[in-house]
Structures are given as structure tokens and as C-alpha cells.
Amino acid sequence: MPQFRKYKIPLLWLRRHTSTRNFILISSVLVGLTAGLAAVVLKTLVHYIQQLLAYGNRLLEEPVWLVVFPLVGILLVVFLVRVMFNGQLGRGTASILHSISQKSSMVETHKMYSHVLTSGITAGFGGSAGLESPIVVTGSAIGSNFGREYHLNYRDRTLLLACGAAAGIAAVFNAPIAGVLFAIEVLLTDISISAFIPLIISAVVGALCSRIILREELLFFADQLGVFAASHVPFYILLGVLTGLMSVYYSRAAWRVEALFEPFQDQPYRRALVGGILLGLLIMLFPPLFGEGYGAVKLLESGKPEALLQDSWLSFFGTNEWLVLGFVGMLALVKVAATTFTIAGGGNGGNFAPSMFVGAHVGFFFSRLANMLQIHKLPEGSFTVVGMAGILSGVMHAPLTAVFLIAEISGGYTLMIPLMIVSASAYAMVKYFEPFSLDTKKLAQKGELLTANKDRTVLRIMQIRHLVETDFQPVRYSATLRELVEVIAHSRRNLYPVVDEQQKLRGIILLEDVREIMFKQEKYDKVLVTELMSAPPAVVRHNDTMAEVMKKFDETGAWNLPVLKGELYLGFVSKSSIFTKYRKLLIKTTGN
């Protein structure tokens, strides 16, 4: 702790004595460096865990261990999450989007290291999920906590959060442009030109970390590419349509498989057993599903699909080219189940690497089938690589990220035109069937997803619990007019909730409605409150979104509405306080 304070003091001095813009630039270097180092630690952790498991008697060659290792990894992660993190981890990019929209870009401190540990164990033990989403969460947590530590406002804190995510993606793939585009497409709904510089700095620093420290075999590169020819364009368009449809299948299959685990929501170890065993059985049938899957992608890209059958049940039937093609197609279909078993079972990982795995297999399947049927001679390596962009674009709803990521990991822009064709075609196809990505659908259903629409973005950031006013004097349900007059005399409001002994709202009284009768003293003990109250024009629930609240105000024309939790009275929310809060948030989020 003293060591940390030694570095904190000069940063506090800089915070006080430099402009916010310059401090953000300095911060982007530090956030990028830290997130890049976190990515290095994660990749190294997975590598050494797998080396340890393979050490000795080459246990991974025995099929039984393919079942045991993923199960052990998931159980270990569930145990660690319950013991170290109170059972709360918050997986995937969706958790960061939720933090941006609902928590003012405040990410829990433990996420700076918890996702490195848990995803490293998951993937290291053979869990069929990617490391990219966990490193996005880790980088985002680093940026968010840095901004909170130095008292940055919401807008700048969100920018540093995105810087951490950009650095994480850049470090994992050694692809800084893709890191920047990912932050813009997925995390930042409203971006200004000035925000590009910190994002670029963080991404470059993160990529340099991985390039300097990591050995080349721990990074994924694609280099066996064919030459692009104009005659291939129709086939790339078809591949775009196919990857778009496969992306729809991937997303819907993931949601349905995940729904199977809902009965075990409160039974984490049983859920882990079910997910781990099902994953292990799938890996026994399809060994390439073990781990992230980049090894299988490399085999396809280098033209060695026969090696995928090694140790599989189909190896007994030889390496017939149709058999190999069918196996590749089956891998593309079952990968989503393996990934969902891993994550829903309690492991930690994301859909980034699995999307690339499926895309590579779809691209290879398509091109190999065309070649075998002698429809047209297609470069299988190129179609394998471009297929990754198609599925990534469709599943993540991030077409620009997909294009530039694949361009960067393939070492150039030879395939830029086919990448753009396939990515755009797949994205257009998916948007027709699924307007939201795999990570954002649940947030959208809850009304918690930020969009490029500034009005909706501000409304989604606003939360009803911060707007409830409790200075309205309640009146007892059994009260008389005399008691009501006493309440009016000590109140600054002209609206009075009527509640019973259980604090349940029974009605409301407006001062205008009782102004005449309140001066007739002879009726003070004869008239009851129940005779004077009326039903509110509408009620606001404590968990309503601000869009729902504003709709109720528009429909009723009211200026104040009661807020209830169940039937319990909490207070009132006023249209004027909403407008005041809205204006402040609009200034805070846009800087205007």
C-alpha cells in the first residue's frame, strides 16, 4: 500500500496542476500500460496452465481427461467466485455496458483482477470460451477505477473505461486499430474527435506490451492467404449471407441453451456439474472444442483440416475428404453449445474467440465445398480468414472491428475488399433478424442499453430512486378533516398522500380540492379523509425505466406521480425534478 501511494502522489499533483485534457492523455498511457500487462498475464496464465496439464504422461492425449479438465476448471471458478467475490462476477461486455448506463461508469474494483484469474482458469482447463471479453472487462475496470480515484467526471471516466477496453483488445490480438474501433462501436455511443487520441494512445501502448513481452506463439496470426480476384466477389457475397445466417443461429442457440440452466440459477455447483459434464462429452466427440480453439483455426487457415480428426471418434474411418468436410461443418454448429455450456455452467469467458472459430470453419467449409464440387477454384485460406470477420461482425454487431481486426492479424490489407463485403453483408443480414447483439439483447429488453440517441441515452442513465421526493406529508387513511387541516398547516406542498397503517397508498388529496371545505370548522370532525381523496392519475413503480415514467407523465398530464414498491408508498416523483436532472446529465454526458 505505501508503494502504491508513492506513485499516486505525483499523479494527484498532475491532476491539480494540469488541464483535464492533458491529464486524460497521461492517464490513457497508464491505463493502456496496465490493461496491456493484464492481457499479457492472462495469456501467459492460460499457456502455463495448459503446459502444466500436458506435462508428465501427456494426459491430454487420454480422452477421459478431456472430460475431467473442463469440469474441474468450471468447478474451481465457481468456488473462487463464491469465496472471493461473494458469488458476483458480472460476465461479458454486457456487464460493462450496464455499468456505463446504470452505475455512472463505476466498475467494481475486484474486476481489475477477478476476470484475469477466473477466465485464465476456465480457458486453461479447456473451457470452450474466449479470453477477449474478460480482458475487455478487466481493462474497463482499470480505466473506470483510475477515473474514480482521481475524481474525473462521468464523461471522462467513461472515456478511460473505453481506453482500458481498447488496450485489452489491442494487446490480445496485437491489433491497435481494432481495439480503438471496438471501443467506439461497442462501448461508446457518443464519440467526439477529441476522444480518439486517448483511445489511440491506450491501444498502441497495450499492443506494444504484448508485442514486447509475449512470445509470438501466444498471439494469433493468419498468414497463409491467397490472392484476391474480382471473380471471387460473388462467392464472398454468398459467404457474407451464410455467415449472417450462422450468426443468427449462433445468437439464438446461445440464448436457448442458456435458458436450460435457469432452473439451476440458485444452485451454482449443480449448474457447474451439468455444464462441465455436457461440455466434456462434447469435447470427447469433438476434441478441437477444447480451449479457445485458435489451434483449430490455424490448421484450417494453413490447409490441414485432416489434423482436426486426430483423437476424434471419426479418426477410425480415415481421412476421407467428405468426412473431413462434414466434421468441419459439425464443429461450426456445436461450438456455440460448447461455449454456452462453459459460460452458463459458471466458467468465465466470452463469445469473441468462439465467433472467430465458427467463422473460420464456415469460411473453410464454404470454399472447400465449392472446390470439391468444382464450381470455382477458391483460396481456402482467404475464405477461412474472411469467414471469421463475417461471424464476428454478426454476433458482436461490430462490422468495423471485424474488418480491421482480421486485416491486422493477417498482416496487411490484401483482403480488405472481401473483408468489407462479407462483414457488411453479414451485419445487414443479422440486423434484419436480430436488432441487438448477443451481449446487448438482455440490456435492451430491460431498457438499460445506451444508444446514439442522446435523449434516450440520458433517460436510461437516470434512475427513479435518485428522483424520489419524500417531503410530502402523508395523511392517515382513517383521519378526519381536522387532522388533514393540521397536516396542511405544516406542509409546504399542495399534494398529500393517504396511507394506511401498513404504509400502503390508498389515494391522494389535492389542496385545490379541499380549499373550500377546510374553512368550515363545523365539518372538521364529521368529514373523513376517505370522502375527500381520489385515485392518482397513475403510479410509478420503483423499478420503472425513465422512458416508462415519462410516458406516464405524457399520458396523464400530471406534474407529480406517487412512487410505489409493490403497494408501499415511497414518495413522489415530479416532472420538474426530472427535467432539471435531465438537463444536468445532458451537460455531463455530452460536455455541452
Residue ranges and their predicted role:
Residues P198, E469, E516-K520, S534, ...:
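Phosphate-coordinating loops and pocket residues in cytosolic domains that bind phosphorylated ligands
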Residues P379-S382, T530-S534:
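C-terminal hydrophobic structural anchor segments
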Residues V458-I461, I508, K526, F572:
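Short aromatic/basic micro-patch
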Residues V475-R492, V498-V499, M518-Q521, D525, ...:
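The conserved cystathionine-beta-synthase
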Residues G507-V514, F572-I578:
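Short hydrophobic beta-strand motif reused across regulatory alpha/beta modules
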